[in-house]
């Protein structure tokens, strides 16, 4: 009688241990979404926000600040974001093997090659553009690469949420290009930057839906 009473408890304990092990394995294979999204969100929110305040539509200056400050801040924060998200992804990929490891590595190289290709094009075109359109080229082009890579990531890992994020970033970027220099910075700051922060928070609260 005593053994029969203990059996359900043993089964429940086994299920609990299995679930804990599954959760631990999932956490080890999945990078912290906050480290993947928040750094980029902060970089865009702050960096493009400063660009809008200093280089507004039609050359308007909303806040007088040194010319070098907005771009320097944006580039610095984007470098930090690239390093932080790259390290987070690399740590997670160490536990992968086979096809999953190869997919992650190829996806990482796609980021590098995508930006390299865009930079090569932008460097060639920049001397032929005015300052405001040159700024739009670099801003819209870099955001375009990011949006495309998130779309690809959503397709590769069959993540609807990740694909929707890429779609949103792409749509916001297109809208910014249509309205033109100055306004593009504001739209990216609030639309894309805030979206990245919200997405990182959502992915952290709802693990397992993004990767």
PLM region spans:
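Membrane-proximal helix-loop-helix units in multi-pass membrane proteins
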Residues: 99, 103, 107-162
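Helix-coil boundary and interhelical linker segments in multi-pass alpha-helical membrane proteins
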Residues: 52-65, 123-135, 179-183
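Terminal transmembrane helical module of multi-pass membrane proteins
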Residues: 146-211
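Juxtamembrane membrane-water interface segments of multi-pass membrane proteins
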Residues: 23-27, 86-98, 163, 203-211
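Residues within membrane-spanning alpha-helices of integral membrane proteins
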Residues: 34-37, 41, 75, 112, ...
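N-terminal juxtamembrane cytosolic/stromal segments of multi-pass membrane proteins
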Residues: 1-33
């Amino acid at each position: 009688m005593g053994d029969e009473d203990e059996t359900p408890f043993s089964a429940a304990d086994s299920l609990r241990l299995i679930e804990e092990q599954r959760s631990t394995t999932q956490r080890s294979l999945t990078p912290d979404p906050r480290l993947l999204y928040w750094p980029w969100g902060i970089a865009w929110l702050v960096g493009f926000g400063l660009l809008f305040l200093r280089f507004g539509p039609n050359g308007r200056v909303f806040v007088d600040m040194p010319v070098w400050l907005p771009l320097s801040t944006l580039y610095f924060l984007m470098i930090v974001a690239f390093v932080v998200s790259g390290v987070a992804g690399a740590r997670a990929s160490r536990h992968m093997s086979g096809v999953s490891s190869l997919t992650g590595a190829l996806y990482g190289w796609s980021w590098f090659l995508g930006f390299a290709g865009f930079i090569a094009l932008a460097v060639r075109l920049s001397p032929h553009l005015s300052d405001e359109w040159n700024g739009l080229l670099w801003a819209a082009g870099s955001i375009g690469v990011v949006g495309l890579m998130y779309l690809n990531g959503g397709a590769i890992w069959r993540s609807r949420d990740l694909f929707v994020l890429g779609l949103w970033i792409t749509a916001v970027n297109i809208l910014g290009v249509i309205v033109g220099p100055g306004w593009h910075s504001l739209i990216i700051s609030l639309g894309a930057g805030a979206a990245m922060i919200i997405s990182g928070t959502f992915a952290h609260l709802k693990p397992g839906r993004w990767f």
